Amino acid sequence: MTHIESTFSFLGLNPFIIQSLNEMGYVKPSPIQASCIPLLLEGRDVLGMAQTGSGKTAAFSLPLLHNLNINLKAPQILVLAPTRELAVQVAEAFSDFSKYMIGIHVLPLYGGQRYELQLRALRQGPQIVVGTPGRLLDHLKRGTLNLSNLHGLVLDEADEMLRMGFIEDVETIMAQIPKEHQTALFSATMPEAIRRISKRFMRNPKEIKIQSNITTRPDIKQSYWMVYGRKTDALIRFLEAEDFSATIIFVRTKNATLEVSEALERNGYNSAALNGDMNQALREQTLERLKNGRLDILIATDVAARGLDVDRISFVINYDIPMDSESYVHRIGRTGRAGRAGRALLFVENRERRLLRNIERTMKQSIPEVQLPKVELLCQRRLEQFAKKVQQQLESRDLDEYSALLDKLYSTDDLDIKTLAAALLKMAQGERPLIIKPDVIKRQSRDLLFQDDRRREDNRNSRTRRDRRDINKDAELYRIEVGRNDGVEVRHIVGAIANEGNINSRNIGNIKLFSSYSTIELPKGMSKDLLQTFNRTRILNKPINMKLLRDSRHYENKTTHRSIFNKDKNSNRRVSDGSFNKSNSPKKTEFKSSFFRRRNV
């Protein structure tokens, strides 16, 4: 399809959907949307090749919503996503687009949620279900997810599901769906396994291929920072270390604009929030203050910042990483205006590394990592700024009266002038001390790990890993009842554990494959609920029945000895690159809060 419709209204979508799109600021469909929406409205199967950030979520959700039977309280649309983050994102998009379609219910299903909450939500009859393959397959086997009324199936980021080892689960799910349904498959690349699925399960699909033309200007210096510790503290440190005329900080939610603005105000920064709740008069007043220099920092959402064009902005901070590449490019494009150089910084959480890779892949360039500014730099910056203020006072002409006061202080207290000046300097520093204590937070050694992880992304099969004999003190050894005889590979185990347990793959330790079982190192402190979740988890359609090995050191020595005796080179298939080194490991409580947090539906 070559013709690109000028607006969404011309595509023939439900007026209530158009109302939501207008409110969200959608005007002109992207190429993938203009190509896919008419085909899906007609009931055709679609095979779409497009990068993340091309607008593919709207490309499949809008036409499927249009064809939905609101009165039927049963799953009619099923979306498979590789990660819980993407599942939540897609579910939120469906909810936003159907805001004015009264009676539409959307349910995300993924590992880590309590089953009773999911079962209760399923009994309410959601028309749209978005989930990860493992959890969806589990519900199908339990008989708690009824797909007899399904007419629309979407595979989002199919190549990512293949990479994470979920493709067998995907095929199992697709084999249980009624034959009379419509399928949309989206993938950034088209490996043979994805082609095989399209040939087996799709009916004469129309192939849509969209070439990414997202580019950034070379005069914008980009970098990212891997988040550790408190983001607000890091934000303040970056602002203090950076020379900027004005900066805009992008966040995802309206509440975040207020929270970040309040945090900056408490630390002496002249900032303001910009969100959709502001009336037009206040919005214009805020932007005018930014333009004329009475305001230096603006915290905004993507929607609120639409159309914002201020030449003073020299620094853009992505406090919350955008979910698509196009939004990232639009954000950072607001700096470096009027022939000036710009600077863009991206905060990346551990669980958001996939989004960073998507941005880099789409832009066809690598974004360098930066470190948190050191205390020495902050001390130097504060001293320089303080010296400027002192110099300004020295150049003023009204110091005579203060000189007289100084004489009184000096003669009364019998102090030498240097000690008195030091005392006054300490008093004058205010809330920003000129002498800063060394960093309390010790950064984990992420640099090589993260860079190596990205380099290994495309050549997993050729990687070799060093053997580690001992179990780290911050890890526990578990046994799972799947092994080489089941066709299991390390990538299958990593994908299942990371997705179902919401554990970053870097915190999965040594994995050893044996004939009928495998062993895996996981962080200490796993809750009973999470262990039960893993017990129900399936890999290649087989329950793993995870069990803690009490005498882990003895067991590890035993299996290592047996591996050497049998000369089984494949028994040591995966050893994490220092994930649990004592010097790099977070505290046990940090493991619990970061990796084992339970989420409700």
Swiss-Prot record:
> Where does this protein reside within or beyond the cell?
Cytoplasm
UniProt keyword annotations, A-Z: ATP-binding, Cytoplasm, Helicase, Hydrolase, Nucleotide-binding, RNA-binding, Stress response
**Domain spans labelled Helicase ATP-binding:** 37-208
InterPro entries attached here?
CsdA_RRM, DbpA/CsdA_RNA-bd_dom, DEAD/DEAH_box_helicase_dom, DEAD_box_RNA_helicases, DEAD_helicase_DeaD, Helicase_ATP-bd, Helicase_C-like, Nucleotide-bd_a/b_plait_sf
Cite the SMART domains for this sequence: DEXDc, HELICc
Alphabetized Pfam families for the sequence: DbpA, DEAD, DeaD_dimer, Helicase_C
Q motif: where is this motif? Answer: 6-34
Q: Which reaction does it catalyse?
A: ATP + H2O = ADP + phosphate + H(+)
Q: What is its main location?
A: cytoplasm
Stretches for region Disordered: 552-601
Q: Superkingdom of the source? A: Bacteria
A molecular function GO annotation = RNA helicase activity
Q: Locate the residues binding ATP.
A: 50-57
Here the segments flagged for biased composition (Basic and acidic residues) are 552-576
Annotated Gene Ontology cellular component terms: cytosol; ribosome
Task: Tell me where the sequence motif DEAD box sits in this chain.
Answer: 156-159
Q: Name one GO biological process term.
A: RNA catabolic process
Q: E.C. number, please?
A: 3.6.4.13
* Root EC class: hydrolase
Q: Does the keyword Cytoplasm apply?
A: yes
The protein's job, in short, is: DEAD-box RNA helicase involved in various cellular processes at low temperature, including ribosome biogenesis, mRNA degradation and translation initiation.
> This protein is called what?
ATP-dependent RNA helicase DeaD
Q: Which gene encodes it?
A: deaD
